[in-house]
Amino acid sequence: VNRNGTLYNLSYGIISAMDLGRIEEKPVRHYRPGTKVLSVGSYGCSFRCGGCHNLDISWGTDALDALARGESRAAFVPPETLVKAAVNSGADGIAFTYSEPAVWL
């Protein structure tokens, strides 16, 4: 969102999806095969790929509109909490996925 010439990322730390799975399910499947990763996604994606199967959790236009209006009930998840969730789930790592990873910057 552009507010008076300053860009704000409304979805930083807002998780739209989270799942524990095998690294082989990710595009980096050859990195550390046999390990488990906690996959997390956030709303917002600058790509519009034909056939995207993550529209509701990546584009999330309704969710982003609610965030912009200050009407969202989505909770901010601090990095430390996300790391604890990964450790507690037995994950070997965290994969930022489901949307364009730069939304986490």
Which sequence ranges carry the predicted segments?
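Conserved Radical SAM active-site core
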Residues: 4-105
